[in-house]
């Protein structure tokens, strides 16, 4: 408050003076604070970074899985070792590093966003030691982003693996086939496809036989 200022210079409108001074520096004036500027904006920013990091973790895990399934191949890097005992191994290490570093970053960011809005009797200094670690949290996040970009740069699609999986999953045609059946007014398309595909291994021959038996125009069957 301006009590001491007002006692010394009662003729001055201290709030107006403070506003002019702060805004002259290009800053936003906050008329209501405790002994320090509230950390609410910092907490909001840290929460936003943590949400971004969570999205990146989701991407890391998905790409790691696609590499494991063989949908993506990783370009070889000369001199890189994937395993101490398996010389053939090419690890998705960049995505693992990114995920691990983001876990550390988000642990710190969560503490920041929970701690910084709180000040015991509006005057304790526990925020000081916490604020000194902002760079640590953001540094781990930046390392993770760099690892992610490095990993993405090494990826190449494995079309053969995608084609092999697609050729082994004829049941995925259940949705478009039943939609065409509906468009032509055939009865119970969902139930028919459910009976054909649910819990069963569908082959190209069985799907072709089912389509051949439908009362559909020849051009639709050929598609």
Residue ranges of each PLM-predicted region?
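Catalytic-core signal marking the mid-to-C-terminal active-site face
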Residues: 81-223
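Internal glycine-rich alpha/beta core junctions
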Residues: 1-115
């Amino acid at each position: 408050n301006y009590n001491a200022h007002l006692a010394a210079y009662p003729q001055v409108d201290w709030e107006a003076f403070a506003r002019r001074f702060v805004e002259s520096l290009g800053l936003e004036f906050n008329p209501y604070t405790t002994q320090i500027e509230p950390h609410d904006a910092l907490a909001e920013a840290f929460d936003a970074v943590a949400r971004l990091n969570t999205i990146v973790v989701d991407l890391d895990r998905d790409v790691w899985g696609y590499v494991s399934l063989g949908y993506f191949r990783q370009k070889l890097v000369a001199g890189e070792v994937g395993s101490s005992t398996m010389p053939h191994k090419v690890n998705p290490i960049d995505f693992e590093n990114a995920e691990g570093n983001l876990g550390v970053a988000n642990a710190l960011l969560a503490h920041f966003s929970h701690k910084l809005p709180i000040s015991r009797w509006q005057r304790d200094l526990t925020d000081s030691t916490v604020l000194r670690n902002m760079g640590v949290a953001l540094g781990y996040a930046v390392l993770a982003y760099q690892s992610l970009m490095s990993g993405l740069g090494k990826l190449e699609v494995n079309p053969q693996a995608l084609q092999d999986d697609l050729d082994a999953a004829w049941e995925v045609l259940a949705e478009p086939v039943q939609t065409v059946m509906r468009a032509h007014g055939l009865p119970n398309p969902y139930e028919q496809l459910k009976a054909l595909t649910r819990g069963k291994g569908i082959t190209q021959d069985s799907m072709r036989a089912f389509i051949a038996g439908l009362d559909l125009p020849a051009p639709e069957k050929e598609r």
